[in-house]
Amino acid sequence: MNPNQKIITIGSVSLGLVVLNILLHIVSITITVLVLPGNGNNPSCNETVIREYNETVRIERVTQWHNTNVIEYLERPESDHFMNNTESLCDAKGFAPFSKDNGIRIGSRGHVFVIREPFVSCSPTECRTFFLTQGSLLNDKHSNGTVKDRSPYRTLMSVQIGQSPNVYQARFEAVAWSATACHDGKKWMTIGVTGPDAKAVAVVHYGGIPTDVINSWAGDILRTQESSCTCIQGECYWVMTDGPANRQAQYRAFKAKQGKIIGQTEISFNGGHIEECSCYPNEGKVECVCRDNWTGTNRPVLVISPDLSYRVGYLCAGLPSDTPRGEDSQFTGSCTSPMGNQGYGVKGFGFRQGNDVWMGRTISRTSRSGFEILKVRNGWVQNSKEQIKRQVVVDNLNWSGYSGSFTLPVELTKRNCLVPCFWVEMIRGKPEEKTIWTSSSSIVMCGVDHEIADWSWHDGAILPFDIDKM
């Protein structure tokens, strides 16, 4: 075969392959367009599909064209109504685990914030964990000295419940070293307290935008709940303290609508001390169980009505629930006065169940270790010592810390009552352990119709970290 014949042969073969390739593409397109849509189980090629995720991540509009998806991210629409939250609390026979973030364990090798004061609050579509960061990460040099409560680096951030407080999923909420947050059914309201001790300011955010402020009125570390505020029929309530931590201070209850303060009242409580209230809605009122950091080992109780009238006293039960505290057998209880002579304290909570009360407390009487929740018959109204239920959440070999309350709204549960829930903070690092940092993780429990076995859902991180050995 001469060279010209070889060229002609190669060219003919190449041309044949090109024609065959074109025919194969035509067949493929014909099958895709004509045959596949004929199957009743598949949507048409150019159908637009709206996918709404039950979380605050995104809503997608997916336009399907042949084998290509075009995804457009849409802004989540506002709910068109406020949550009611006037229902009574559901009766709880026990508390089942809802979530656990394991933030410190993950943070030994992950990008997790150094935090304290975590708490949970829920909207009609989700629950979120809020926390106060220290503007630093675990196992990093900036974590040094984070045992300090107040600094210009502290911020309120949040993640979806169960997620660790990591840099990739956290959402900024407010600049704050003290905070509260709640959802009215339409938008989140957050309140962050920041600034110098003598002139601190609380900034109210609604839907992520600053909408109002509260300036310190007593000039002594204005502070708030470190747990969920409470919204009832579109109006949101919270409690603030300004004044000494170890003697008489000043206390106020506030009410806001869509981020604007519409009312406040001074709470008269001579001889009593109120800090870090854990509040929840119940039968149209706000019920709070707080911390007495002055003398009482029983907890203050504050019940706020929609018109901001209130009743204030102490949890009646004949068992103390603050830490440090004395022996149960030596405690008598009082509905009106602080009992015991133990200064300091720890944030805690309680739930009214008719005349009974569920009350959480550390297992240790002297330190923030272990955690249990007790049900005391008639403990909301009498100095009763009759303990009818007890559940251990963290054993006494492991550290606990703050604890607080929130409820699951009926929009989430589809029940006709509000599910009582609580969280327990588990503090690690300074001052109890040999580290340069202080941080915490949390376990969250919700009321159920069954008794739940004792167990220890403790933090579990192995300390010290690498940064502590340098």
UniProtKB/Swiss-Prot annotation:
Virion surface side: 36-470
Top-level taxon: Viruses
Glycan attachment sites: N46, N54, N84, N144, N293, N398
Region of interest: Involved in apical transport and lipid raft association: 11-32
Localization: Virion membrane; Host apical cell membrane
Ranges where the record places region Head of neuraminidase: 89-470
PTMs per UniProt: N-glycosylated.
GO cellular component: host cell plasma membrane; membrane; virion membrane
Protein name: Neuraminidase
Annotated source species: Influenza A virus (strain A/Herring gull/DE/677/1988 H2N8)
Upper lineage: Viruses, Riboviria, Orthornavirae, Negarnaviricota, Polyploviricotina
Gene name of this polypeptide: NA
